[in-house]
Swiss-Prot record:
Protein name: UDP-2,3-diacylglucosamine hydrolase
Molecular-function GO terms, alphabetical: manganese ion binding; UDP-2,3-diacylglucosamine hydrolase activity
Cofactor: Mn(2+)
InterPro entries on file: Calcineurin-like_PHP_ApaH (IPR004843), LpxH-like (IPR043461), Metallo-depent_PP-like (IPR029052), UDP-diacylglucosamine_Hdrlase (IPR010138)
Binding site for Mn(2+) 2: D42, N79, H114, H195
EC numbers, comma separated: 3.6.1.54
Similarity-based family: Belongs to the LpxH family.
Length: 241
């Protein structure tokens, strides 16, 4: 049966070669009968700029390119890799999607996004999110020296980890009113997102559904969508060696 696959929150980095290995294995062996692949944010733990190419990012681009030569591969920016630009996506053969993207998926109107915009109770993060989304901020960052960008990325990552440890569970999850509002404004019956690292299929009403993809910290997490519905599948790293 034909299917569309969604993954997100891989947080690939040079420090976790096991995740990179698992993802490349998935790209090479886990896409049978797949019509399209959606990577919905935080593919990388941090992205310093398309002009700073680490060896593992080159390997990832080449592996994705092999897939995109056969099927469409779509990419949504996350909160960690929001600086990924056209250069990398061109190398990987990925099409960059807008922050909120709607598609009719096997007869169900579906809205796709990373999900951080739905965590409206996290006021401090939403303030930072608006700031880093400004064109002038992105322009200034992209023109900083490479060493400076590396230092900024390291500090942002450290501050994010420390901040999340102090936040309540509810603050770091999506806000139900934000979910309801987005479904209403887009006219969709299904929402697919990541960001929270809490994989689940939530049946909101008889007609509406919210599906959350999982992270790849301890195992792979894949969402298969077909005409039969949605299925969350785990990929143990032990099977990718």
């Amino acid at each position: 049966m034909k299917k569309t696959i969604f993954v997100g929150d891989l947080h690939l980095s040079a420090d976790r070669p096991d995740i990179t290995q698992a993802f490349i294995y998935f790209l090479n062996h886990g896409l049978d009968n797949t019509e399209a692949l959606y990577i919905i944010g935080d593919l990388f733990e941090v992205w310093m700029g398309d002009d700073i190419a680490e060896s593992f990012t080159i390997a990832i681009a080449e592996a994705i390119k092999t897939v995109s030569n056969s099927i469409p591969v779509y990419f949504t920016h996350g909160n960690r890799d929001f600086m990924v630009d056209k250069q990398f996506c061109l190398r990987a053969g990925m099409k960059i999607l807008p922050e909120v993207y709607c598609i009719n998926l096997y007869g169900v109107n579906t809205v796709i996004l990373h999900g951080d915009s739905l965590c409206t109770l996290d006021i401090a993060y939403q303030r930072f999110r608006r700031f880093r989304s400004l064109d002038i901020v992105r322009w200034v960052y992209s023109h900083l020296p490479k060493k400076t960008r590396l230092n900024i990325a390291a500090k942002i990552r450290q501050k994010s980890v420390q901040g999340n440890q102090q936040k309540h569970y509810e603050i770091m999850d999506v806000e139900s009113s934000a979910v309801t509002a987005l479904l209403a404004s887009t006219g969709c019956q299904r929402m697919i997102h990541g960001h929270t690292h809490r994989p689940a299929i939530h049946q909101l009403t008889a007609q509406e559904q919210r599906v959350v993809v999982g992270d790849w910290y301890t195992q792979g997490s894949v969402l298969n969508v077909s005409e039969k519905g949605c299925e969350l599948v785990t990929l143990p790293f032990s099977e990718t060696n």
